[in-house]
From Swiss-Prot:
It catalyses: CMP + ATP = CDP + ADP; dCMP + ATP = dCDP + ADP. Gene3D superfamilies: P-loop containing nucleotide triphosphate hydrolases. Its main location: cytoplasm. Its EC number is 2.7.4.25. It comes from Shewanella oneidensis (strain ATCC 700550 / JCM 31522 / CIP 106686 / LMG 19005 / NCIMB 14063 / MR-1). The gene is cmk. Keywords: ATP-binding, Cytoplasm, Kinase, Nucleotide-binding, Transferase. This is Cytidylate kinase.
């Protein structure tokens, strides 16, 4: 890890636009990309591929320490492309089996510690865009610039509804809204690493803003922060 490599953290709730803005920033700046929300799913899939028992904390921790994963800028359908051991697993990590397995491996404290170190190892030159929920508060507390994207629960539910409809899923928007509100409450009130803006983060409400406007706000802020540290 290079402590000198700049890192920009982008935190916020699901559906606020973190994934889209993160990959656009990474592409624009030519920086590395970290999608921390996918990392437990990637680890779970690696365990399944290597026939590692999900209940074996020692084996899962070892796997986490050497996890061969890359995040690449993708396209409009999948903003972030996830590569595990050279294989595109962007779709594979979204299965229910993988989701259930991710919940199991995430319960181990040693696994969480190993993945924390693994995430910090993404901080390499020329820089890193880190997308998540506790990037600016826990993983990279000394980040060069910190952003927190948010939007109303109704707007985020509508975005998720449109996204799933485009992929051919039959979904209920009221159920999506209820799930988002429930997850917000859980994430914001959990005792460890609650979902809150970092103390010195720029908060951007994306509810009534287009992608280009949010990107411009983010870039202006990042450039300002980077120029003040040089």
């Amino acid at each position: 890890m290079s402590e000198r490599a700049p890192v920009v953290t982008i935190d916020g709730p699901s559906g606020a636009g973190k994934g889209t803005i993160s990959q656009l920033l990474a592409k624009h700046l030519g920086w590395q990309l970290l999608d921390s929300g996918a990392i437990y799913r990637v680890l779970a899939l690696a365990a399944i591929h290597h026939d590692v028992e999900l209940e074996n904390e020692e084996s899962i921790t070892l796997l986490a320490s050497h996890l061969d994963v890359k995040f690449l800028t993708g396209n409009e359908k999948d903003p972030v492309q996830v590569i595990l051991e050279g294989e595109d697993v962007t779709t594979a990590i979204r299965t229910q089996e993988c989701s259930n397995a991710a919940s199991k491996v995430a319960a181990f404290p040693r696994v969480r510690e190993a993945l924390l170190r693994r995430q910090r190892a993404f901080r390499t030159a020329p820089g890193l865009i880190a997308d998540g929920r506790d990037m600016g508060t826990v993983v990279f507390p000394t980040a060069s610039a910190k952003l927190y994207l948010t939007a109303s629960a109704q707007e985020r539910a509508q975005r998720r509804y449109n996204q799933l409809q485009d992929k051919g899923f039959d979904v209920n928007i009221e159920r999506l809204l209820a799930e988002i509100i429930e997850r917000d409450d859980r994430d914001m009130n959990r005792p460890v690493a609650p979902l809150v803006p970092a103390e010195n983060a720029l908060v951007i409400d994306t509810s009534d803003k287009g992608i280009d406007e949010v990107l411009e706000l983010a870039l202006n802020y990042i450039n300002q922060k980077l120029s003040s540290t040089n």
